[in-house]
C-alpha cells in the first residue's frame, strides 16, 4: 500500500482495506461486507422513514431522505405528488434488508472458505497486482459496464414505468427517451444559454442524458476490458498504478461527484421535485459555504433538500482532503519528513 520507504507496513484495524492490499481475496471480502452495510443502511432507513411518515405534513419538511427519492421515481405517488400507497416503500426496504444478509453471507464465505488471493481460486480472470495496468484496466472496464447498465436501467424505467414530472404534477412516461440526445451533447454539454445541465427542466432531456451517459459508460467498459492502457498513458499516470494511487483517484472521483450532487440537489426541481424535497436552497458563507432553506420552517426543522445537499457537500469536501493526502503519498512524499523538520527547528 505504502509507496515510499518500507512497503512492508503492518496496518491496524483503523486502516480499513489497507490491511488487505496484498491479499486480494480478503480485499474482495471486505468490499462485499461494505456493500452489505450500505444495503443494510438503505433498507433500515427506508423502513424507519415509512414508520414516521405523516401524510398531513409536506414530505420535504419531515427530514426524510430516501422516501423522497422513491417518490420522485414515481413509486407510490399520484397526481399532485400525493403519496397514495406506502407499501412499495416497505417492500423496497425489506428487499434491501434481505439483500444485505445475502451480501454478508458472501463476505463471510470469502473470508472463511475463499482463497487469500483471487489468483489462487478456480477463476483467476480478475487476479491482479497494483502495478499491472492491463488487469487494472480489465477491472475498471467491468465497473464501467455496471454503471452503464444502471444508467440504461433508468432509461428503461422512465420509458415503461414513468417518473414524477414536477412540471405537470403527475407521473408520466417518456415514450422516446433518446429523442433529444443531440441537444444533450451539443447544448447541455457546452453549457449553452438556457441549457445549463444543473437546471435541466424537462424529462425528455433528463432521459436522453442518461441514455447518452449509459452508452458512453458501456463503450468505455468494453474499451478498457479489451484494450490495455497505451504506453504514453502508463507513463503519464504512473503514480496511479499503485494501491495508494488508485485510492487517491477513486477519492477524487467521489469528491467531484459529491460536489456536483450537492449543487444539483440544491437548485434542480425536476429531478428533485419541490413536492418531495422542498424549495430550492440559497448559498451562504461563513467559515465554509453552506446551503440554507429559502422558506421559513419551524425551529430545528430542515427540508430534505437541505439535508441531502449539505451532507453531500461536506462529505465531498473531506473526501477531497483524503484524495490530496493519498495522491501526495502516491508520488512518493513522506509526510513524516514534515514532522521531523519541525522537530529539528524546535531543537
Swiss-Prot record:
Residue spans crossing the bilayer: 25-45, 64-84, 91-111, 206-226, 247-267, 308-328
Signal peptide feature range: none
Record GO terms (molecular function): chlorophyll binding
Localization, UniProt: Cellular thylakoid membrane
UniProt keyword annotation of Thylakoid present: yes
Cofactor note text: Chlorophyll a.
Gene Ontology BP terms: photosynthetic electron transport chain
Primary location group: membrane
Entry's Gene Ontology cellular component terms: photosystem I; photosystem II; plasma membrane-derived thylakoid membrane
Keyword Cytoplasm attributed: no
Membrane topology classification: Multi-pass membrane protein
InterPro entries: PS_antenna-like (IPR000932), PS_II_antenna-like_sf (IPR036001)
Lineage: superkingdom: Bacteria
The protein's required cofactors: chlorophyll a; chlorophyll b
UniProt keywords, alphabetically: Chlorophyll, Chromophore, Membrane, Photosynthesis, Photosystem I, Photosystem II, Thylakoid, Transmembrane, Transmembrane helix
One matching Pfam family: PSII
Family: Belongs to the PsbB/PsbC family. IsiA/Pcb subfamily.
Quaternary structure annotation from Swiss-Prot or TrEMBL: The antenna complex consists of chlorophylls (a and b) and chlorophyll a/b binding proteins.
Its biological purpose: The antenna complex functions as a light receptor, it captures and delivers excitation energy to photosystems II and I. The Prochlorales pcb genes are not related to higher plant LHCs.
Stated name of the protein: Chlorophyll a/b light-harvesting protein PcbB
Organism annotation: Prochlorothrix hollandica
The organism's taxonomic lineage, starting at the top: Bacteria, Bacillati, Cyanobacteriota, Cyanophyceae, Prochlorotrichales
Amino acid at each position: 500500500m505504502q509507496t515510499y520507504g518500507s512497503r512492508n507496513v503492518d496496518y491496524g484495524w483503523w486502516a480499513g482495506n489497507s490491511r488487505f492490499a496484498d491479499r486480494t481475496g480478503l480485499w474482495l471480502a471486505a468490499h462485499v461486507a461494505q456493500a452489505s452495510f450500505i444495503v443494510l443502511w438503505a433498507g433500515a432507513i427506508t423502513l424507519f422513514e415509512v414508520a414516521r411518515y405523516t401524510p398531513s405534513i409536506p414530505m420535504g419538511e419531515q427530514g426524510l431522505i430516501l422516501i423522497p427519492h422513491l417518490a420522485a421515481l414515481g413509486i407510490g405517488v399520484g397526481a399532485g405528488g400525493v403519496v397514495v400507497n406506502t407499501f412499495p416503500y416497505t417492500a423496497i426496504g425489506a428487499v434491501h434488508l434481505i439483500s444485505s444478509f445475502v451480501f454478508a453471507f458472501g463476505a463471510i464465505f470469502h473470508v472463511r472458505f475463499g482463497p487469500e488471493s483471487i489468483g489462487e481460486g478456480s477463476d483467476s480472470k480478475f487476479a491482479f497486482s497494483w502495478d499491472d495496468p492491463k488487469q487494472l484496466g480489465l477491472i475498471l472496464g467491468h465497473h464501467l459496464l455496471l454503471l452503464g447498465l444502471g444508467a440504461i436501467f433508468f432509461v428503461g424505467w422512465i420509458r415503461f414505468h414513468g417518473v414524477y414530472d414536477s412540471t405537470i404534477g403527475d407521473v408520466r412516461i417518456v415514450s422516446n427517451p433518446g429523442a433529444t440526445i443531440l441537444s444533450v451533447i451539443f447544448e447541455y454539454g457546452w453549457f449553452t444559454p438556457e441549457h445549463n445541465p444543473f437546471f435541466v427542466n424537462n424529462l425528455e432531456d433528463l432521459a436522453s442524458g442518461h441514455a447518452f451517459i449509459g452508452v458512453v459508460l458501456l463503450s468505455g467498459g468494453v474499451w478498457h476490458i479489451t484494450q490495455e492502457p497505451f504506453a504514453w498513458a502508463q507513463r503519464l499516470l504512473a503514480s496511479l498504478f499503485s494501491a495508494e494511487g488508485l485510492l487517491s483517484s477513486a477519492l477524487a472521483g467521489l469528491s467531484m461527484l459529491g460536489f456536483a450532487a450537492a449543487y444539483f440537489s440544491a437548485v434542480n426541481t425536476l429531478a428533485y421535485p419541490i413536492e418531495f424535497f422542498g424549495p430550492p436552497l440559497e448559498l451562504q458563507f461563513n467559515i465554509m459555504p453552506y446551503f440554507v432553506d429559502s422558506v421559513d420552517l419551524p425551529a430545528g426543522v430542515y427540508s430534505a433538500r437541505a439535508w441531502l445537499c449539505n451532507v453531500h457537500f461536506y462529505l465531498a469536501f473531506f473526501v477531497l482532503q483524503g484524495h490530496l493526502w493519498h495522491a501526495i503519498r502516491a508520488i512518493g512524499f513522506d509526510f513524516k519528513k514534515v514532522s521531523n523538520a519541525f522537530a529539528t527547528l524546535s531543537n
